[in-house]
Design a protein with these regions (language model features):
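N-terminal small-residue-enriched
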Residues: 1-468
Length: 468
C-alpha cells in the first residue's frame, strides 16, 4: 500500500541514475497514463491512476546467526473512475496490455451501478501542485545483504552486552525503495522515489512469568540519519533491564508523564479527531470545536509534509493537490480539519491537501510529519515537583473512544516519588478524558524527530491510574 506522491517527476528523474538498475519511472508513468486512457475509452467521465513499484529486503538475526533473510519486489496499479457522480476503485498486479484494458472496463462497469455521491470527484485543477521542492527522500546507496546482517548483529551484540540482559528477542535490519506515479485525466502528473532504512532490537530479562522484554528501533529514508546499531541495541538492553521486577500500585489519581516513545500517541488521538471523514460523519468528539481553545496557549501542533528527509514527506497529496505546513493547533486553538476534496465538499470547505490513498482505495484524509512543539523545562524539571506519579513508557490496547473522547489504556512504566523515577510498574490502566488531557498537557524540551508523529515528554495532570 502507498500513501501519495512525495516528490516531483523532475526530482524523481534526477535521482534515477543511482537506482536505474532497480527502477524505471518512465515505465510506471506510461503504465499509469495507459490506465487513464483506457478508462476514458471505456466510458469514464474522469479517472486517476496510481502505479507502484516496491523493492524491500530484510535480515533477522538471533544469537549471532541469521534466522531469516528475505527480499520482495512487486508492481501494483490502482484505478479510480467516475461516471457522473458515481465512483469505483479497482486494483491489480496484472500490468499487461490486456490486463490494463480489462481493469478499466471492470472499473467503469462497477461505477455505473454504484450509488450517486455528490461529493466525489477529482481535485479542483486550480489547487494542483505546480512547484515541487526536492525533499531528499532517496538514499543513493543501497545496502548489501551482508551490510544488513552486520547492522542487525551489531545491535544484538550491544544489547546482550548490557548487564542483566539474559537473552535476545531478535534483531533486524531492513532497506527498501518505493516508486509511485499518479496520473489524472485533468492532466496532473507526479511521481516519487523514496528509500527506507531501519534497525530494531528486542531484549529479554528473566524467564517464565518473570520475563520482561523491551525494544528500540530507528528508521529514516537515509542510512546516515539512523541511530547507530550499537545505540539501538544498548537502548533496548537498558530499557529491558530497567523493567525487571515490576511492582503493582494502588488505584489513585496522580500526574502522569508520557515518555516521548508514547507521548506521540496523544497527538495521534487529536489528529484522528480532526480528520475530515470523522467530522463529516459527526463521529468526532471535536466536531463542534473548530476555533476553540483546547490546549494551553504555549502549545502548537504542526503537520509538515515538506520536511527534508522526513519519514512522511511529500510535495503533493494523493489527488495532486499542493501541500503546505499547517499548524493544526496554534497557541492552543484548533485551527483546521484535515481534508481531502470529498470531505471538503461535504463540509463546504476547501481541501487542505491531506488526501492519502492505497492502490485499492479512494482518497481519504490523513496526516504527514506531525509534531508537538517542545516546551522549556527539561524532563527532570517537568517531574521535579511530583510527589507521587506515573511515568509511562508503554501503552497497551486501544481503549480510546473517538466519539466521546473517553480515554482508557493499559500501560507500564515507572513510579515517580518526590520528583524521581523509581521502580518499574506494570499491569495498570490510565484513564481520563481527552478534553482534560489536552487542557492540562505540558511539554518538556526534549523533542526529537524519530517517528512519523513526534512529541517531547508530556505531563498530564490528574489521570486515574488503575492498579490493585
Amino acid at each position: 500500500m502507498i500513501s501519495s506522491p512525495s516528490t516531483s517527476t523532475a526530482s524523481a528523474s534526477s535521482s534515477k541514475s543511482a537506482t536505474s538498475d532497480l527502477f524505471d519511472q518512465s515505465a510506471l508513468s506510461a503504465l499509469a497514463q495507459r490506465l487513464v486512457e483506457a478508462a476514458k475509452r471505456a466510458g469514464a467521465d474522469a479517472a486517476d491512476a496510481v502505479a507502484v513499484r516496491n523493492i524491500s529486503q530484510g535480515v533477522e538475526v538471533r544469537d549471532g546467526r541469521v534466522e531469516e533473510s528475505e527480499r520482495s519486489e512487486g508492481d501494483d496499479v490502482g484505478l479510480r473512475v467516475l461516471v457522473g457522480r458515481r465512483q469505483a476503485v479497482v486494483s491489480t498486479n496484472d500490468v499487461s496490455g490486456d490486463g490494463v484494458a480489462k481493469l478499466a472496463e471492470r472499473a467503469v462497469a462497477m461505477a455505473r451501478v454504484a450509488p450517486d455521491d455528490k461529493y466525489v470527484g477529482l481535485a479542483d485543477p486550480s489547487l494542483l501542485a505546480r512547484d515541487f521542492p526536492d525533499l531528499d527522500l532517496l538514499d543513493p546507496k543501497v545496502p548489501s545483504t551482508s551490510e544488513l546482517e552486520r547492522r542487525a548483529c551489531e545491535a544484538e551484540a550491544a544489547a546482550l552486552a548490557v548487564k542483566g540482559v539474559t537473552k535476545s528477542g531478535g534483531a533486524s535490519a531492513s532497506t527498501g525503495i518505493g516508486g509511485m506515479v499518479l496520473v489524472t485525466s485533468t492532466g496532473s502528473h507526479g511521481s516519487y522515489l523514496r528509500s527506507s532504512q531501519g534497525i530494531s532490537m528486542t531484549a529479554i530479562v528473566g524467564d517464565g512469568t518473570g520475563m520482561e522484554r523491551d525494544y528500540d528501533y530507528t528508521s529514516a529514508p537515509h542510512a546516515s540519519d539512523l541511530a547507530s546499531p550499537a545505540k539501538v541495541g544498548r537502548t533496548a538492553g537498558e530499557r529491558t533491564v530497567a523493567r525487571a521486577n515490576p511492582r503493582k500500585v494502588e488505584t489513585c489519581k496522580v500526574p502522569v508523564v508520557f515518555d516521548p516513545r508514547v507521548s506521540n500517541s496523544l497527538v495521534g488521538h487529536l489528529v484522528g479527531a480532526v480528520n475530515g471523514a470523522s467530522i463529516a460523519r459527526k463521529t468526532s468528539f471535536l466536531k463542534d470545536r473548530l476555533g476553540e481553545q483546547l490546549f494551553a496557549k504555549n502549545i502548537r501542533i504542526i503537520d509538515d509534509p515538506l520536511r527534508v528527509r522526513g519519514l512522511r514527506s511529500q510535495s503533493f497529496d494523493a489527488e495532486g493537490v499542493k501541500v503546505k505546513k499547517l499548524a493544526i493547533i496554534d497557541e492552543g486553538v484548533l485551527t483546521s480539519w484535515l481534508l481531502d476534496s470529498a470531505t471538503a465538499r461535504e463540509l463546504g470547505l476547501v481541501t487542505t491537501g491531506h488526501a492519502h490513498r492505497g492502490v485499492s482505495s479512494s482518497p481519504s484524509p490523513g496526516s504527514y510529519n506531525l509534531h508537538l512543539e517542545a516546551g522549556e523545562p527539561t524532563p527532570a524539571e517537568l517531574i521535579s515537583d511530583i510527589a507521587q506519579g506515573f511515568y509511562v513508557t508503554d501503552l497497551i490496547g486501544s481503549g480510546v473512544n473517538g466519539v466521546t473522547g473517553d480515554y482508557s489504556r493499559g500501560a507500564s512504566g515507572f513510579w515517580i516519588e518526590n520528583g524521581e523515577i523509581t521502580y518499574a510498574v506494570s499491569e495498570v490502566t490510565i484513564a481520563g478524558h481527552l478534553f482534560e488531557i489536552f487542557k492540562s498537557l505540558a511539554p518538556a524540551n526534549d523533542l526529537e524527530f524519530r517517528y512519523g508523529v513526534n512529541a517531547p515528554t508530556l505531563r498530564i495532570e490528574g489521570l486515574t491510574v488503575g492498579g490493585r
